[in-house]
């Protein structure tokens, strides 16, 4: 059995296992990493992102990816796409390293999501309406350092949003968006072809081989 460990990103700790009071489910940490931008030649870290997976992700991903090395997985887009589209629930935590207005944060997320959906032909009126609902959820949110947004993604295309002043998962979700393309696009922009966090991709690729080969013990 592989032991799941916590991951530290700057001052943010991503525990090995979390239970969501909103869904009642327990998730293990697939990986975590930083997201930043190079501004005037200096890399500034803005956010730590952790991707948590439901335990049924292990047999689902192992069917195709068991036995692959970290080096093989990190360069394989289909591996990440199988995490994104897999028939298991995901819980993504995005915690701020620097303060950020919710509207500013969501604007960039939405731009990336819309660009991806347009590129793959999944953006239509329903997706535009879902993106509007996404924007509305963040309108009055301001993230202090350590504050978090949680994205709960169910296999049937439901995206649950919740906000916390720390790493605590709220009991109630602030918004629920029922749109599979938008839900998938959120994670795609983080770990897909044009990922905002290569660090997160590396973390998933380094941690999951042992889990897929040996199962998990937490």
Swiss-Prot record:
Biological pathway: Secondary metabolite biosynthesis; flavonoid biosynthesis
Homology family: Belongs to the chalcone isomerase family.
Catalytic activity: a chalcone = a flavanone
Induction of synthesis: In roots by B.japonicum.
Positions of the record's site feature: Important for catalytic activity: 105
InterPro entries noted in UniProt: CFI (IPR044164), Chalcone_isomerase (IPR016087), Chalcone_isomerase_3-sand (IPR016088), Chalcone_isomerase_bundle_sf (IPR016089), Chalcone_isomerase_sf (IPR036298)
GO BP, one annotated term: flavonoid biosynthetic process
Functional summary from the UniProt entry: Catalyzes the intramolecular cyclization of bicyclic chalcones into tricyclic (S)-flavanones. Responsible for the isomerization of 4,2',4',6'-tetrahydroxychalcone (also termed chalcone) into naringenin.
Protein name, per record: Chalcone--flavanone isomerase 1A
Additional note from the record: Part of the biosynthetic pathway for all classes of flavonoids, a large class of secondary plant metabolites, many of which are brightly colored.
Molecular functions (GO terms): chalcone isomerase activity
Key words, A-Z: Flavonoid biosynthesis, Isomerase
Its EC number(s): 5.5.1.6
Transmembrane segments: none
PANTHER family, per database record: CHALCONE--FLAVANONE ISOMERASE 1A, CHALCONE--FLAVONONE ISOMERASE 1-RELATED
Tissue localization of expression: Expressed in roots, shoots, flowers and seeds.
Binding-site residues for substrate, renumbered to this chain: 47, 112, 189
Pfam family for this entry, one: Chalcone
Record carries keyword Cytoplasm: no
């Amino acid at each position: 059995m592989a032991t799941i460990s916590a991951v530290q990103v700057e001052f943010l700790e991503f525990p090995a296992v979390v239970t969501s009071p909103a869904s009642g489910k327990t998730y293990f940490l697939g990986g975590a990493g930083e997201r930043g931008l190079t501004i005037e030649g200096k890399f500034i870290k803005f956010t730590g992102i952790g991707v948590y997976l439901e335990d049924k992700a292990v047999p689902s991903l192992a069917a195709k990816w068991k036995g692959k090395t970290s080096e093989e997985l990190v360069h394989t887009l289909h591996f990440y796409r199988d995490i994104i589209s897999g028939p298991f629930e995901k819980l993504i935590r995005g915690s701020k390293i620097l303060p950020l207005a919710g509207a500013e944060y969501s604007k960039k997320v939405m731009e990336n999501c819309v660009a991806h959906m347009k590129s793959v032909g999944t953006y239509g009126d329903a997706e535009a309406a879902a993106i509007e609902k996404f924007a509305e959820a963040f309108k009055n949110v301001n993230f202090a350092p350590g504050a978090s947004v949680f994205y709960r993604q169910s296999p049937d295309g439901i995206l649950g949003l919740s906000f916390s002043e720390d790493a605590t998962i709220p009991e109630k979700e602030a918004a629920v968006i029922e749109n599979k393309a938008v839900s998938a696009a959120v994670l795609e922009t983080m770990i897909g072809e044009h990922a905002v966090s290569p660090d997160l991709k590396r973390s998933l690729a380094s941690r999951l081989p042992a889990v897929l080969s040996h199962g998990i013990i937490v």
